Amino acid sequence: IRTHTLPCKCTICPKAFSRPWLLQGHIRTHTGEKPFSCTYCNRAFA
């Protein structure tokens, strides 16, 4: 039984999230965006 709503819906796939920041992180899986980089090894991460 779900006790919360999922108002933030992905426009690319059927997934939905309860928080906007969760959706924002999920969208990166579709776009390939990696905005965070390690200052030690320079690898980029989502």
Curated annotation (Swiss-Prot):
Which cysteines bridge via disulfide bonds? none
Q: Which domain of life is it from?
A: Eukaryota
Q: Which InterPro entries match?
A: Snail/Krueppel_Znf (IPR050527), Znf_C2H2_sf (IPR036236), Znf_C2H2_type (IPR013087)
Gene Ontology cellular-component terms for this entry are: nucleus
Which key words are in the record? DNA-binding, Metal-binding, Nucleus, Repeat, Zinc, Zinc-finger
Q: Where are the zinc fingers (C2H2-type)?
A: 1-4, 8-30, 37-46
Q: Which GO terms describe its molecular function?
A: DNA binding; zinc ion binding
Its chief place of residence is nucleus
Record keywords: Ribosomal protein included?
no
Keyword presence, Ion transport: no
Q: Where in the cell is it found?
A: Nucleus
TM spans (from-to): none
Query: A Pfam family this protein belongs to?
Result: zf-C2H2
Q: Which family does it belong to?
A: Belongs to the snail C2H2-type zinc-finger protein family.
Q: Would you tell me the protein name for this molecule?
A: Escargot/snail protein homolog
